[in-house]
Amino acid sequence: MFGHIQPVTISARAATEIRKIMETKNIPSEYGLRIGIKGGGCGGAALMLGFDKKKETDQEFIISDLTVYIDKKHTLYLIGKEIDFLENDNARGFMFIDPGKEVEIG
């Protein structure tokens, strides 16, 4: 469906932090970064990150030299998003940035 078009981008800061987590948490090498959505009730859908094996319904992308799995049903909700990593005195974590919209913390 999307061919070589990547639905999301991952900042260098976020990619570095993802690699650190994979190393320190001993994530198996056959796992990739799963990006998706969960929920959808009154609060709406929440964006999520995790590590997982590839599933039959996944599309596979190489983004910032990371293997990324996105369920085909979630791809349209993620188009144009950027994953960044924030670290300051008040907060530390991954953010989903959607140009033109408010920042969503995941």
PLM feature spans:
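Local cysteine-cluster metal-coordination motifs and their immediate loop/turn environment
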Residues: 38-48, 103-106
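N-terminal first-folded block
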Residues: 6-34
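Acidic and generally charged, gly/proline-rich low-complexity regions
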Residues: 53, 58-106
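A cross-taxa feature marking solvent-exposed loop/turn segments within ectodomains of secreted
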Residues: 26-28, 42-44, 76-78, 89
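Immediate flanking context of iron-sulfur cluster ligation sites
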Residues: 27-38, 95-101
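Generic secondary-structure microfeatures
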Residues: 22, 37-39, 74
